[in-house]
Amino acid sequence: MKLLTLNTHSLTEPDYEAKREIFVNFMAAEQPEVFALQEVNQTAAAPLLGEIPAGYTPCPGNGVPLKADNHAAAVAKMLADRGVHYHWSWLPAKMGYDKYDEGMAVFSRAPITAAENLLLSKSDDYSYWKTRRALGVCAGDVWYYAVHMGWWKDEEEPFAAQWEKLSRAAGAKSTAFLLGDFNSEADVRREGYDLILGSGWQDTYRLAQ
């Protein structure tokens, strides 16, 4: 089974369109069963997306419509144009750089049968840059969560509190994978990475070595 996760910095990256093309070509060649993306942006002031690519599953509680430059929608369409079809979902968590709807996306080769909108931070203010959410999707009786966590030493929105919410919700599922940007270095002891492993979760990267 192939899983992939990437923080895309979409729309903000230099040479964004060229890098997006490279990424889509790579994904079309590798075709992982599931991949999760973070910082999946769209311009808040952009016009509505005219035609939503096939396979889209709206996430409950998401009141933000897809816009014309939505990164996840672009990836879904570009993959479909290459004959590679994914089921996908997108969830914005906050306003980024005062102009982007910034969120996460999950793409699955198997049909998505359910989606979950999970608030991780104490803040539920869409305009606040520290607001954090997780997007969960169920495909083939397995749950996959795309996450973009806060920092360990953030006194206002600490990683540990967000992790407790995520671990409790995902851990209640029979089988779950967590994919994303945890903002935690694996070689730093007694912080986020050690907390995750100490909570009973396993690092699939290490298991695959």
Located regions from the model:
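Active-site regions of metal-assisted phosphoester/phosphodiester hydrolases
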Residues: 1-34, 58, 80-81, 85-209
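Short, solvent-exposed beta-strand-terminating loops
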Residues: 27, 40-48, 142
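A short beta-strand submotif of the Rossmann-like class I SAM-dependent methyltransferase core
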Residues: 37
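Short, flexible/disordered intra-domain loops and linkers
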Residues: 13-15, 44-68
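Substrate-binding cleft of extracellular glycoside hydrolase catalytic domains
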Residues: 62-74, 95-96
